Amino acid sequence: MYRWDSIADVSTHRGIKHQDYKGKRVHIEISDDFDNVLSLKMDIGVHKDLDIEQEEYCFDVCFQEDSASVLINSCEQMITEKLKSLIRFGTRSTRYKDVFDICYLSDLADMEKLRFCIQKYIYADTTIDVNDSDEIRRRAERIFNSSTYKKQVERSKKNWLDLSVEEVLKKDLEFLYRI
């Protein structure tokens, strides 16, 4: 179990600026009594768009009577953000962890909410020329069938799932056919 008092290092790396929000990237290193260490980065920002429902997570702060709550993006919003980046940059994308995140999140996604997010953040975005789910699938297939892209994903060591890269890309494509 990780405790708040076991956070070894918290540092603000840099400001981030996306179209939909501005914020800070925070690097956190958490360790436990067994010398297990978890390093992660967290983007903290404020969205301009209040139409999308955020999920509230509450953390018990051991040394205070109060708790801390944060609002996080829904898995549908996370998938949409990752898809949008993949579509925008294609095989040039260096966000290799995203294909594994999409694979994991695909089991949790509500398809109606996902379609709403895709409509709002991908189809309505005039900076990328994507108007339907067929185009999303075509682009994803082109990217995932690229031997160069597959090799880069393999070498990235961003695979946090107990699946091969081939299995993950196949599952991601199957998921995209359900949109």
Regions picked out by a protein language model, each given a short descriptive name:
Residues 1-179:
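Structured mid-to-C-terminal alpha-helical surface segments
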